[in-house]
């Protein structure tokens, strides 16, 4: 009852609204004769579309608005009474035409009645399913006559419409006015057997044609309300002119207040009844003209299709189903000349009508209709009027109207072309705009190649386009490994063989890559894989065939011209100090002269190295055979002596491991001028020394015991300086260490006896380091020979070495020659230590731990030790104290594990910076003292803070926390040595390093920091020996460039870290599930 009252209240409120729901007819005479009793009692719940220019005075009617649930209820008495009785009385009292704007996607094509044709037979009531939720008027058997209009562009067009019987569907959602009948949308095909409307499609049902309201003005345009295909019946043309005259006076009497709103809404909803599926399925079985379909969705222009009079003899109606019209034929058919997407040809293409138009109707070819004789042709021909909406077409399309129809608007010039099947099939290009859009049509030619592509502009006032294209697989990218980032490769991984990159380098840095490119110019390098087949022997052969021999000869001649002036100047400055040293000085002067031609300045600091050029290396073939061998890759080290008097540039070229110098004896002009016997002895001694040390400086590690024959200091020096090219692990034998100490002390003695004002005694401050490893016998004999000489002759020879920008790695600094003392060698070469401290190798226990991050050196310097071999070695060496080698497993410490007191009392742990480098400070006291500072200190839980950060005892705590389902054991140890081996050790090391620099730089500014007494280096322990915490060696003075204060990070434990408690059950919380 409450819903009934609400429904009547709602209807009353709508009745009192200003003329919004009033009944009206296009014919004012018929609307004035209606009474309130004859008016409809039922109105749609949503206001329908209307024509605002012809509104009669409002007429009261009985309430017809109901709530939705009452309309949907089958037992609604109000619905049944109002919809039938009032409608029948209304239709019976309205013999003339009543208005109806209908929207459907099913269109009726019927034969136009003749002039004298009587009224059509009554219509049977349509069949409605009981479950229909649509609210619309049901038509009785009474028929309504259709008022036809015929207007010219100078007049307003007829606004009368025919009412269509209610068809199964839904209410049109529109706004603005109410009509006698509600607008419905056909959801199913009326001819379909599943639509339950087979009776409604009989030949006697739809005798009322669908008349389109063809007003094309923007103010009064019922055709703008919705798209429809309307058949214009020309049979009452003359009678309709009188009706037009009668309506013209009353059409503009009154304007509805909701007109502007309704027009805007209706324009936005013109194609609302057509979904995408409808448009796709429009013409799969249809041959309808595409211009007819295009005109169906626009209301401002007309396209006419005329048929012969022979179609009047047919009695059955012709149903044109809009769902059968499609764009398929325009996309794929051979009849089309261009795609329809965004093209004005869309309106000029033709399709034959659907097969559902029976009895041969509309089969004749279309003909043009002239406006002057249109009345005569309307009596004999049927014209299909299609309303077009020009809202979007005004902006996109420009059409010609060859049928002389009136224009869309008085201000518009866009006209529709007649549908000509022959012209479209033959590709007729009479349309003036076909040529203008040829380029646009080409953009859509690939629609057939895509899986789905539909683009239909001008229908929904928007463009919907979905395209799926097969995309080819992209080409795989080629990446160059980082190991070859310095090489020059093109896109095909081939080496660049031109000199462009070398010339660019010369312009920027004064450097040249001629040697690198020369080595790459070899015919053996054709592909990327050929790089792996290169060897040093191939490069040596390529060096002999270098094309720079002419340049070398030129430089030799130019040098010989200036040699006399240079020699006179040199002799005047140095007096008698040039006799025995002229061999090295001549070579050095020649090479320095060649440098000055390119660089124009000597090498005084680190940045001067970047001004060097590799081109000058090609001119060094004038070196002696022994000297070229000394600087080749076959020579593992650089020997001191007179023949070692090579320029700075020559020594620095060792960093390029590809350089192999030829033993070309272009050295004769210097030998002729210096024929002393000492030079011959020195040269032969150097040659013999290099030959003797070639085999001894390449130790091989083939078994576990060979690890102890490797020297740490030599491996550190070679790994930092990069001179250990053949020694991949950076290893030097113990004999080499003794040779280093002997030869270095010799250099020190000679450098101190050098005059301070000697121009060549100044040591260039560069961060490079070399290792000098002569044999013991040759070094001692050479040292004794040099010591017995006069001294002045050898000073120049020694100064040639001190003049080089290398740091001489040595652990000796004493005023006395300690090389003859057996105690010196015993102290320097302490007995071999057990692993891991001595060999700096790791013992892998197959644990998943962060072992690599704790090693401050590259993993290439480490050895993989077989545990079985290590155990065998320990048994032979009587090392049974396996407590020192145990690595505590992660979370695997036994509960009663007792840490050894010896490790805790070890004094070495106070100053250890890393467990890998321990034991070097007090080696002379106890060679085996660093055993306790092995990986136990890193991986053991001893000395680490626990969660509570509280006081610790020497032994682990025995207490446990027993909960309901688990037992947690906490391990605590004393905290007295935690700070010594962790955070404070870094501070202590830095303080020691600062004091070391101060002590070194106060008394001596020129002397290399590595040439010091062994006691001074041993006192400094790890920091003085293991220098690779620095990018550049820390032993150099502080005046070098770049700065030496940058340190590499050392992974260590800090006090901030703690261990988690060990839980003896898998569950971590009380409520956590247990494992099965």
From Swiss-Prot:
Residues 1-11 have a biased composition (Basic residues). Interacts with BUD27, GIS1 and SSD1. This is Zinc-regulated protein 8. The modification Phosphoserine is found at residues 275, 354, 403, 407, 632, 676. Keywords: Cytoplasm, Phosphoprotein, Zinc. Residues 23-34, 107-117, 193-206, 214-223, 362-378, 690-701, 739-748, 990-1020 have a biased composition (Polar residues). Residues 408-418, 576-585 have a biased composition (Basic and acidic residues). Its main location: cytoplasm. GO terms for cellular component: cellular bud neck; cellular bud tip; cytoplasm. The lineage of its organism: Eukaryota, Fungi, Dikarya, Ascomycota, Saccharomycotina. Induction: Repressed by zinc. Signal peptide: none annotated. Residues 118-128 have a biased composition (Pro residues). It comes from Saccharomyces cerevisiae (strain YJM789) (Baker's yeast). It is found in: Cytoplasm; Bud; Bud neck; Bud tip. Belongs to the ZRG8 family. Residues 93-106 have a biased composition (Low complexity). Residues 1-66, 85-162, 190-223, 234-253, 357-450, 534-557, 566-585, 658-701, 713-762, 909-931, 990-1026, 1041-1076 are annotated as: Disordered.
């Amino acid at each position: 009852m409450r819903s009934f009252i609400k429904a009547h209240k709602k209807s009353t409120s709508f009745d009192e609204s200003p003329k919004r729901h009033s009944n009206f007819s296009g014919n004012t005479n018929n609307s004035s004769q209606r009474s309130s009793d004859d008016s409809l009692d039922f109105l749609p719940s949503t206001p329908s579309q209307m024509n605002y220019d012809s509104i009669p005075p409002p007429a009261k009617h009985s309430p017809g608005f109901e709530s939705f649930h009452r309309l949907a209820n089958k037992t609604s008495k109000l619905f049944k009474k109002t919809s039938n009785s009032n409608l029948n009385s209304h239709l019976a009292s309205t013999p003339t035409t009543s208005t109806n704007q209908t929207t459907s996607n099913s269109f009726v094509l019927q034969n136009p009645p003749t002039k004298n044709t009587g009224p059509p037979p009554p219509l049977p009531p349509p069949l409605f399913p009981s479950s229909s939720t649509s609210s619309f008027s049901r038509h009785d058997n009474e028929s309504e006559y259709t008022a036809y209009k015929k207007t010219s562009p100078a007049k307003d067009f007829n606004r009368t419409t025919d009412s269509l019987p209610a068809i199964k569907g839904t209410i049109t959602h529109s706004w603005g006015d109410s009509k006698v009948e509600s607008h419905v949308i056909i959801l199913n095909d009326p001819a379909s057997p599943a639509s339950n409307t087979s009776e409604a499609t009989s030949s006697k049902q739809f005798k009322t044609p669908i008349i389109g309201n063809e007003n094309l003005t923007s103010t009064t345009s019922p055709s703008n309300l919705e798209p429809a295909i309307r058949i214009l019946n020309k049979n009452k043309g003359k009678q309709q002119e009188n009706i037009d005259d009668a309506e013209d006076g009353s059409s503009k009497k009154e304007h509805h207040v909701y007109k502007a709103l309704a027009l805007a809404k209706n324009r936005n909803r013109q194609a609302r009844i057509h979904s995408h599926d409808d448009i796709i399925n429009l013409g799969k079985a249809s041959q309808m003209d595409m211009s007819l379909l295009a005109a169906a969705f626009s209301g401002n222009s007309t396209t006419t299709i005329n048929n012969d009079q022979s179609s009047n003899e047919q009695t059955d109606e012709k149903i044109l189903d809009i769902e059968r019209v499609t764009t398929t034929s325009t996309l794929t058919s051979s009849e089309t000349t261009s795609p329809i997407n965004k093209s004005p040809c869309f309106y000029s293409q033709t399709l034959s009508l659907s097969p559902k138009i029976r009895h041969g109707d509309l089969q004749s070819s279309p003909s043009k209709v002239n406006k002057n004789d249109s009345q005569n042709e309307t009596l004999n021909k049927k014209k299909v009027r299609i309303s077009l909406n020009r809202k979007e077409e005004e902006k996109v399309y420009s059409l010609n109207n060859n049928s002389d129809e009136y224009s869309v608007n008085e201000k518009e010039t866009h006209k529709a072309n007649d549908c000509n099947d022959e012209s479209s099939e033959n590709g007729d290009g009479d349309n003036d705009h076909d040529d203008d859009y040829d380029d646009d049509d080409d953009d859509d030619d690939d629609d057939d190649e895509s899986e789905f592509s539909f683009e239909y502009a001008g229908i929904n006032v928007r463009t919907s386009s979905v395209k799926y294209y097969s995309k080819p697989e992209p080409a795989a990218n080629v990446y160059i490994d980082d190991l070859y980032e310095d090489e020059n490769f093109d896109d095909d991984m081939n080496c660049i063989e031109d000199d462009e990159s070398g010339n660019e380098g010369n312009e920027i840095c004064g450097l040249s890559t001629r040697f690198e490119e020369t080595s790459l110019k070899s015919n053996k390098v054709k592909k990327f894989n050929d790089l792996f087949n290169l060897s040093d022997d191939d490069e040596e052969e390529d060096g002999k065939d270098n094309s720079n021999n002419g340049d070398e000869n030129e430089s030799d001649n130019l040098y010989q011209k200036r040699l006399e002036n240079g020699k006179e100047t040199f002799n005047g400055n140095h007096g008698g100090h040039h006799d025995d040293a002229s061999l090295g000085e001549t070579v050095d002067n020649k090479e320095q002269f060649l440098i000055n031609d390119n660089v124009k300045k000597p090498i005084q600091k680190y940045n001067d190295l970047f001004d060097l050029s590799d081109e000058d290396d090609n001119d060094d073939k004038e070196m002696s055979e022994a000297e070229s061998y000394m600087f080749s890759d076959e020579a593992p080290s650089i020997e001191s002596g007179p023949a070692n008097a090579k320029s700075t540039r020559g020594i620095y070229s060792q960093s390029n491991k590809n350089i192999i110098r030829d033993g070309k004896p272009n050295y004769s002009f210097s030998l002729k001028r210096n024929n002393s016997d000492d030079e011959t002895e020195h040269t032969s001694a150097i040659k013999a020394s290099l030959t003797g040390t070639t085999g001894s400086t390449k130790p091989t590690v083939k078994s576990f015991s060979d690890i102890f024959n490797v020297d740490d200091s030599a491996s550190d020096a070679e790994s930092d300086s990069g001179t250990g090219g053949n020694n991949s692990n950076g290893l030097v034998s113990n004999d080499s260490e003794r040779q280093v100490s002997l030869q270095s002390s010799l250099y020190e003695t000679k450098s101190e006896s050098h005059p301070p004002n000697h121009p060549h005694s100044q040591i260039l401050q560069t961060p490079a380091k070399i290792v000098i490893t002569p044999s013991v016998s040759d070094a001692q004999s050479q040292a004794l020979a040099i010591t017995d000489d006069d001294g002045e002759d050898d000073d120049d020879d020694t100064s040639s070495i001190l003049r080089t920008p290398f740091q001489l790695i040595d652990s000796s600094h004493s005023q006395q020659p300690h090389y003859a003392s057996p105690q010196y060698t015993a102290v320097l070469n302490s007995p071999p230590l057990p692993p891991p401290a001595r060999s700096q190798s790791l013992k892998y226990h197959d644990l998943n731990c962060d072992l690599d991050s704790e090693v401050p050196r590259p993993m290439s310097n480490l050895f993989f030790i077989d545990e079985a071999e290590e155990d065998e070695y320990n048994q032979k060496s009587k090392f049974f104290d396996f407590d020192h080698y145990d690595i505590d497993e992660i979370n695997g410490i036994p509960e009663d594990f007792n840490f050894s007191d010896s490790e805790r009392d070890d004094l070495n742990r106070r100053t250890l910076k890393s467990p890998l480098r321990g034991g070097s400070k007090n080696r002379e006291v106890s060679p085996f003292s660093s055993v306790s500072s092995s990986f136990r200190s890193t991986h053991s839980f001893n000395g680490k803070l626990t969660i509570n950060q509280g006081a610790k005892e020497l032994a682990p705590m025995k207490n446990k926390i027993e909960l309901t389902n688990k037992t947690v054991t906490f391990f605590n140890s004393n905290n007295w040595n935690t700070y010594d081996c962790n955070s404070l050790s870094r501070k202590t090391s830095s303080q020691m390093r600062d004091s070391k620099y101060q002590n070194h730089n106060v008394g001596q500014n020129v002397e290399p920091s590595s040439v010091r007494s062994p006691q001074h280096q041993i006192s400094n322990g790890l920091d003085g020996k293991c220098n690779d915490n620095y990018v550049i060696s820390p032993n150099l003075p502080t005046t070098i460039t770049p700065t030496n204060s940058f340190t590499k990070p050392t992974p260590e434990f800090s006090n901030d870290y703690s261990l988690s408690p060990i839980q003896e059950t898998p569950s971590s919380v009380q409520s956590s599930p247990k494992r099965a």
